[in-house]
Amino acid sequence: MPKAAAKSKTTGKVEKRRAKKDPNAPKRGLSAYMFFANEQRENVREENPGVSFGQVGKILGERWKALSDKQRAPYEAKAAADKKRYEDEKQAYNAEADEEESS
């Protein structure tokens, strides 16, 4: 059984070790903003050639904040559908994991 925490040799502080993430676990659902950003990122790069990655993110954030609720609705719908997909996949994944554990 792995240790939950270990003292760091350099600072003496207790460090928590993260559990290894299962590569077969379902991917989390994207937020409405992430759907918007993924769709608009290329447009922002074309309109602002030579800007840094961070600046692209700032511009996307400003554009997202400027959207009305009506303009955000399609992205919110995509996010809700993706959340449902994630919950369904996670439920199936957990059922499969419980089944393997009991075997």
UniProtKB/Swiss-Prot annotation:
Main location: nucleus
Pfam families hit by this protein: HMG_box (PF00505)
GO CC, alphabetical: chromosome; nucleus
PANTHER family: HIGH MOBILITY GROUP PROTEIN DSP1, MITOCHONDRIAL TRANSCRIPTION FACTOR A, ISOFORM B
Family of this protein: Belongs to the NHP6 family.
CDD domains reported for this sequence: HMG-box_NHP6-like
BP-aspect Gene Ontology terms: DNA repair
Gene3D superfamilies for the chain: High mobility group box domain (1.10.30.10)
Region entry Disordered, spans: 1-30, 70-103
Subunit text: Weakly associates with the stable heterodimer of ctc-1/pob3 and ctc-2/spt16 to form the FACT complex.
Protein name: Non-histone chromosomal protein 6
Compartments in which it is found: Nucleus; Chromosome
Function field: DNA-binding protein that induces severe bending of DNA. Required for DNA-binding by the FACT complex, a general chromatin factor that acts to reorganize nucleosomes. The FACT complex is involved in multiple processes that require DNA as a template such as mRNA elongation, DNA replication and DNA repair. Also augments the fidelity of transcription by RNA polymerase III independently of any role in the FACT complex.
DNA-binding positions: 26-94
GO function terms (MF aspect): DNA binding
Biased composition (Basic and acidic residues): 70-91
InterPro entries, per the entry: HMG_box_dom (IPR009071), HMG_box_dom_sf (IPR036910), HMGB (IPR050342)
UniProt keyword list: Chromosome, DNA damage, DNA repair, DNA-binding, Nucleus, Transcription, Transcription regulation
